[in-house]
């Protein structure tokens, strides 16, 4: 299997070539976004047009199938950004804010079957990014078709406590974060909270509440790492006395996720170098340099720099310790 892992973006830009070439496939007068939640109290306006579901179906979903096929062509795995799009999208009427939108359903089973068919044809693993507000129906359908779910350390909880590795599902990709969330080092110092405050997507009251909650979560995470016997003997038990992410914490968190039974385990490129700033800050446009942060090194340089070699060695060590191995993953089932 080709080891490259690609991403299928959520939609086409309203000024993009797809919209100009296939105008009947898009709805004008509305934009897509997401409703208010804890991360974006005002909701999010992604400023792209929703699909014309009637026209897509009448055309046999050709445009959708071609976009999947082309993205799969040079890789062995495909991540579907916001996989809930196959089930419903949050439409915002023109001249209204994200608070005034509503969900509009799509023909999910048709779309998932097209996705599964292309997965088998191209022998590509499918990962559905199912974070945020997700109905039970979505995860049940993904599991039925063999599409991996997305399980992040930050969100996997049993009540307020972090879920132990053994309770993670098999049919999933696991990681600490995504491009939309805090890096590991940024999470530990609360840089993501400060970024939202600087961008004015949260006020000072929300900022203080989130800082208090983060302090509690850091202690819960540290407790979970100790409970999993991943921290070295004599290591500090009080998270308030650990001002920044240490090498020991990074190693233990990586081992925590490597120990899960989940099919895939992913380390984000920002974590080996302890980058503080995430790639994208949801709910912002000009307020944050979204997608403007370059990698510290080129792909060619990665093979020789110490940080990447150390990360590769750590991953090999955890693979050996956990018996995770590199077994093949089957494509989505029809």
Set out the residue ranges of the language-model regions.
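Conserved, well-ordered alpha-helix/loop/beta-strand core segments that scaffold catalytic motifs
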Residues: 1-11
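Short, well-structured secondary-structure segments
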Residues: 5, 266-267
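Structured C-terminal cap/extension of enzyme domains
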Residues: 266, 273-332
């Amino acid at each position: 299997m080709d080891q490259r892992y690609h991403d299928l973006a959520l939609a086409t830009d309203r000024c993009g070539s797809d919209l100009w070439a296939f105008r009947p496939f898009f709805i004008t007068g509305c934009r897509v976004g997401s409703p208010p939640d804890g991360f974006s109290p005002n909701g999010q306006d992604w400023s792209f047009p929703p699909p014309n579901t009637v026209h897509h179906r009448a055309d046999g979903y050709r445009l959708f199938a071609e976009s999947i096929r082309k993205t799969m062509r040079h890789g062995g795995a495909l991540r579907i950004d916001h996989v809930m799009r196959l089930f419903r999208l949050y439409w915002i009427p023109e001249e209204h804010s994200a608070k005034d939108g509503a969900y509009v359903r799509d023909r999910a089973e048709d779309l998932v079957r097209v996705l599964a068919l292309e997965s088998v044809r191209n022998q590509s693993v499918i990962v559905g990014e199912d974070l945020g507000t997700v109905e039970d129906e979505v995860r049940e359908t993904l599991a039925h078709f063999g599409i991996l779910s997305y399980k992040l350390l930050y969100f996997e909880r049993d009540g307020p406590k972090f879920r132990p590795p053994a309770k993670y599902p098999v049919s999933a990709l696991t990681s600490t974060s995504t491009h939309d969330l805090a890096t590991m080092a940024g999470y530990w110092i609360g840089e993501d909270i400060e970024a939202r405050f600087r961008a004015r997507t949260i006020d000072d009251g929300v900022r203080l509440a989130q800082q208090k909650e983060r302090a509690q979560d850091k202690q819960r995470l540290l407790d979970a790492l100790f409970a999993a016997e991943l921290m070295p003997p004599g290591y500090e038990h009080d998270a308030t006395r650990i001002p920044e992410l240490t090498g020991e914490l990074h190693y233990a968190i990586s081992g925590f996720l490597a120990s899960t039974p989940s099919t895939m385990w992913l380390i984000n490129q920002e974590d080996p170098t302890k980058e503080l700033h995430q790639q994208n800050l949801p709910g912002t446009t000009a307020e944050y340099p979204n997608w403007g942060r370059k990698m510290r090194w080129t792909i060619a340089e990665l093979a020789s720099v110490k940080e990447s070699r150390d990360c590769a060695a750590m991953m090999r060590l955890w693979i050996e310790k956990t018996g995770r191995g590199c077994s093949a993953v089957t494509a989505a089932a029809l």
